[in-house]
C-alpha cells in the first residue's frame, strides 16, 4: 500500500510539473508566428532584358574605362578612400551611379569592381567609396549618420567632370538599401534608385522570416523552428542592436524617382515577393509606377555558382547589361509607360515564409531575462555542489571529534539529487550544443541528418525523464513511509533546496527552447 501511495504521489507530481511547464511554455510564446507566404507573383517572361521605347542605349563594352583612387572627407574630418571608374572617351556629360555597401563589405577595393567597371564601359561614371567603419560595428549602426556620409560621396560624384548632376543615382545592396532609402527620402533630386536584395522591412521582422526559412530548408525540428518568435520578440538592448528596429518602411513612401528592384530567387533570407509588392504598393500610392522588378536564378548577391554568398562567384551574365540599359534609359527620360519590356520579369520567385506584421514579446521580455534564467540553473547547481562538499567535510570533522549529532539525507535521496543535478546540467549542455550545430548547419544550408533529427527526440525524452526524476525526488522528501525526516541538518536542507531550484531553473530554460515540442 505504501509503495502504491508513493507511486501515486510521484505520478501526481509528474503530471503537475509537466502541466506547469507546458503552461509556462505557452506563456513564453508571443502572439505571432512566421507563416508560409502565399501571395505569389507571376512573372510574364523569363527574359530579364530591359529596353526603352525611346530608343537603344549604350551597350556594355562601348567605352574604355579609366580608374582613379580619390579621398573623400566625411563629418568629423574622417577621410575615406574611394574609386572612380569612368568612360575615358565620353564626349559631353552622362549619368553616374554611387554604390552603397551592404553588410559584410567595407573596402572600395574589394567590392563592386566588376559591376562598376561594366557600368563605366557603358558610359556611366561610378563611384565606390569605402564604408566608414569607425562608427559601424556588429552591435551598433547609425543609418542616418551613414546616409549623411554617403551624401558627401554623392556630392563629390555630382561635381565630377563628365557627369550630369541631374542624372546621378544610387545602387545599393541588402542593408545598404536602408541607407539609400534615407537618402532618396531627403534628396528628391537623386535621379534613380537601384535596390538589390533589399530587406524592405525592419531588420527584426525580416530576420524572423529569414531564420525560419533557413531552418525549414535544413529540416530543423519543429521545436527549434518555433523558438524564433520568442527570440525575435525580445528586447536586445543588452547587446545594443538598436538598428534591428530601424523604421525602414516610411522612407519607401518617398521613392518618387525611377526605381529598379533586383532579387535572386535562390535567396531565402530576403522577402523576394512580399518585399517587392510592398515597394510597388507604396510607390504606386504616391503616383510613381516607374518601378522595374527583375528576378534572377541567383543568390543574395545576384551571383551564380552557390546559393550562399561566397567570394569570387561570377555575376549573373545578364545582370550588368540590364543595369546599364535601365540606367541609360532612365537618363534618356523613360517614363513608366515608355518601357518596351515588362516591368516584372525573370525567373519565377517562390518566397517560403512571410515577414510578420509585428514582433511582440512573450513572458521572457528581454535577452537579459533569458540569460539570467539560463545562467541561474547552473549557478544554483554549482552552489549546491559546494554546499554538499562543505557538508561532507563538516560531517567528517564531527565524526573525528566528540560531536555525534546526526545529519544527512535519507537512503536513496543522495543518489537522486546527484542524478537530478547531473541530468539537468547535461541536458542544458546538450541542448546548447544541439542549437549551435543547427545554427551552423542552417548558415551553410546543409540539411540535418536523420540522426540529428532523432537527437532532438532523444533530448525531449530525457527532459521527460528529468521531470520524472524531479517528481521522484519530491516523493522521497515529502512522502516517506517510515515517518522519519528525509533531510537532517540546515546544510543538507540548503543543498536540497539549491539542487531543486537549480534543476527547475534549467527545466524552465529547456522549456523556453521548446524541448518538449517533438
Map each language-model feature to its residues.
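Alpha/beta-hydrolase-fold serine-hydrolase catalytic core, especially in secreted/extracellular enzymes
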Residues: 288, 297-301, 305-422, 428-518
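Conserved alpha/beta-hydrolase
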Residues: 116-136
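Short beta-strand/loop motif that positions the catalytic acidic residue
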Residues: 255, 261-263, 267
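Primarily recognizes the serine-hydrolase "nucleophile elbow" in alpha/beta-hydrolase
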Residues: 156-216
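Short beta-strand element of the alpha/beta-hydrolase
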Residues: 92-102
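N-terminal cap/lid segment of alpha/beta-hydrolase-fold proteins
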Residues: 39-92
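Alpha/beta-hydrolase active-site loop
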Residues: 140-161
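The serine-hydrolase catalytic nucleophile loop
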Residues: 105-116, 131, 273
Amino acid at each position: 500500500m505504501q509503495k502504491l501511495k508513493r507511486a501515486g504521489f510521484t505520478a501526481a507530481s509528474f503530471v503537475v510539473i509537466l502541466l506547469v511547464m507546458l503552461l509556462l511554455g505557452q506563456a513564453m510564446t508571443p502572439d505571432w508566428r512566421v507563416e508560409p507566404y502565399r501571395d505569389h507573383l507571376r512573372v510574364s517572361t523569363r527574359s530579364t532584358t530591359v529596353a526603352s521605347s525611346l530608343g537603344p542605349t549604350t551597350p556594355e563594352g562601348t567605352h574604355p574605362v579609366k580608374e582613379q583612387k580619390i579621398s573623400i572627407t566625411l563629418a568629423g574630418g574622417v577621410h575615406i578612400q574611394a574609386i572612380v571608374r569612368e568612360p575615358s572617351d565620353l564626349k559631353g556629360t552622362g549619368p553616374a551611379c554611387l554604390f552603397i555597401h551592404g553588410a559584410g563589405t567595407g573596402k572600395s577595393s574589394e567590392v563592386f569592381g566588376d559591376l562598376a567597371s561594366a557600368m563605366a564601359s557603358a558610359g556611366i561614371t561610378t563611384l565606390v567609396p569605402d564604408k566608414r567603419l569607425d562608427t559601424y560595428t556588429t552591435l551598433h549602426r547609425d543609418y542616418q549618420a551613414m546616409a549623411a556620409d554617403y551624401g558627401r560621396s554623392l556630392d563629390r560624384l555630382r561635381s565630377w567632370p563628365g557627369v550630369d548632376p541631374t542624372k546621378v543615382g544610387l545602387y545599393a545592396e541588402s542593408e545598404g538599401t536602408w541607407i539609400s532609402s534615407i537618402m532618396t527620402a531627403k534628396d528628391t533630386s537623386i535621379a534613380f534608385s537601384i535596390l538589390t536584395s533589399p530587406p524592405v522591412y525592419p531588420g527584426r521582422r525580416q530576420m524572423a522570416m529569414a531564420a525560419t526559412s533557413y531552418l525549414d530548408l535544413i529540416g530543423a525540428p519543429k521545436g527549434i523552428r518555433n523558438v524564433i518568435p520568442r527570440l525575435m520578440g525580445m528586447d536586445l538592448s543588452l547587446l545594443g542592436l538598436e538598428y534591428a528596429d530601424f523604421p525602414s518602411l516610411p522612407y519607401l513612401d518617398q521613392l518618387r524617382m525611377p526605381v529598379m528592384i533586383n532579387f535572386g530567387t535562390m535567396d531565402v533570407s530576403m522577402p523576394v515577393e512580399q518585399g517587392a509588392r510592398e515597394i510597388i504598393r507604396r510607390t504606386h500610392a504616391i503616383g510613381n509606377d516607374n518601378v522595374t522588378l527583375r528576378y534572377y536564378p541567383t543568390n543574395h548577391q545576384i551571383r551564380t555558382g552557390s546559393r550562399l554568398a561566397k567570394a569570387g562567384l561570377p555575376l549573373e551574365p545578364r545582370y550588368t547589361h540590364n543595369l546599364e540599359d535601365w540606367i541609360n534609359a532612365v537618363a534618356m527620360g523613360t517614363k513608366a509607360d515608355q518601357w518596351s519590356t515588362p516591368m516584372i520579369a525573370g525567373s519565377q520567385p517562390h518566397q517560403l515564409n512571410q515577414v510578420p506584421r509585428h514582433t511582440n514579446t512573450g513572458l521572457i521580455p528581454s535577452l537579459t531575462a533569458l540569460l539570467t534564467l539560463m545562467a541561474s540553473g547552473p549557478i544554483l547547481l554549482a552552489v549546491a555542489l559546494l554546499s554538499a562538499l562543505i557538508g561532507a567535510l563538516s560531517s567528517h570533522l564531527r565524526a573525528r571529534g566528540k560531536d555525534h549529532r546526526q545529519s544527512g539525507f535519507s537512503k536513496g535521496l543522495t543518489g537522486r539529487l546527484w542524478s537530478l543535478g547531473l541530468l539537468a546540467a547535461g541536458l542544458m549542455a546538450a541542448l546548447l550544443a544541439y542549437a549551435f550545430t543547427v545554427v551552423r548547419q542552417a548558415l551553410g544550408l546543409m540539411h540535418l541528418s536523420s540522426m540529428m533529427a532523432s537527437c532532438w527526440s532523444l533530448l525531449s525524452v530525457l527532459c521527460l525523464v528529468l521531470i520524472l526524476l524531479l517528481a521522484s525526488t519530491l516523493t522521497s522528501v515529502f512522502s516517506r513511509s517510515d515517518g522519519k525526516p528525509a533531510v537532517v541538518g540546515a546544510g543538507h536542507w540548503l543543498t536540497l533546496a539549491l539542487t531543486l531550484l537549480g534543476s527547475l531553473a534549467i527545466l524552465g530554460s529547456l522549456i523556453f527552447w521548446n524541448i518538449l515540442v517533438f
